């Protein structure tokens, strides 16, 4: 063997041993990466199989809920149409008179101010949210102020609450407490201006 051959043989042998050392060091790293990749792909495959079994159930539930909402919309529209088609009976003069009488208002049946029939639209317009006029507030005050002394005292309040069927009106002490909370002059009664302030704070 010549020197060149010997040198190349030694170089080859040393490079071969270096390769073996580096491959023996990299094998555990590649094995670990391989293990995690295989585990990950198995997990993805299992998850895909698992969820694919339940996907038709999810789609079915979605279809059922969409169908139910469409049926509900359809039924609502049918009921709305039936309601529109019914004759609008509204309120008759006697019904309005009964309500006015229970509130202590004049109920002269011969009064032409009361119509013979009120449609449901007219009744709903009565309850639209709008700011009451001063005259309407005065009329409301007069409902409470039966003795027309210009004040609402606990007895006046109790009378109206009892007529309206509210249980708070059954106890006179409850009525006194309510009056005290709005009584600016601390005399145990509310005057018209206090009533106006109450209405402004609560309804305007």
Curated annotation (Swiss-Prot):
Name of encoding gene = CML46
What residues bind Ca(2+), as annotated? 145, 147, 149, 156
A molecular function annotated in GO for this UniProt entry is: calcium ion binding
Free-text function comment from the UniProt entry? Potential calcium sensor.
Tell me yes or no: is Repeat among this UniProt entry's keywords. yes
The record, for Gene3D superfamilies, names:
EF-hand
> Which SMART domains does this one have?
EFh
User: PANTHER family from the xrefs?
Assistant: EF-HAND CALCIUM-BINDING DOMAIN CONTAINING PROTEIN (PTHR10891)
A single GO BP term for this record reads: negative regulation of defense response to bacterium
- Asked if the Swiss-Prot or TrEMBL record annotates the protein with the keyword Metal-binding, the reply is yes
**What positions does the domain EF-hand occupy?**
72-106, 132-167, 170-204
Per UniProt, the keywords (alphabetical) are: Calcium, Metal-binding, Repeat
- What is this protein's name? Probable calcium-binding protein CML46
């Amino acid at each position: 063997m010549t020197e060149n051959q010997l040198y190349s043989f030694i170089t080859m042998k040393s490079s071969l041993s270096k390769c073996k050392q580096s491959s023996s060091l990299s094998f555990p790293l590649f094995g670990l990466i391989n293990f995690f990749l295989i585990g990950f792909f198995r997990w993805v495959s299992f998850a895909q199989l698992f969820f694919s079994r339940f996907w038709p159930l999810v789609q079915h539930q979605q279809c059922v809920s969409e169908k139910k909402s469409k049926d509900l919309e359809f039924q609502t529209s049918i009921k709305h149409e039936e309601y529109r088609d019914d004759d609008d009976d509204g309120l008759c003069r006697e019904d309005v008179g009964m309500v006015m009488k229970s509130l202590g208002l004049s109920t002269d049946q011969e009064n032409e101010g009361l119509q013979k029939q009120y449609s449901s639209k007219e009744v709903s317009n009565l309850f639209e949210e709008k700011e009451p006029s001063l005259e309407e507030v005065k009329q409301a005050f007069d409902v409470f102020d039966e003795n027309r002394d210009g004040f609402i005292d606990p007895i006046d309040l109790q009378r109206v609450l009892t007529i309206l069927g509210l249980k708070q009106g059954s106890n006179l002490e409850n009525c006194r407490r309510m009056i005290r909370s709005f009584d600016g002059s601390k005399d145990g009664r509310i005057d018209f201006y206090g009533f106006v302030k109450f209405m402004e704070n609560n309804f305007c």
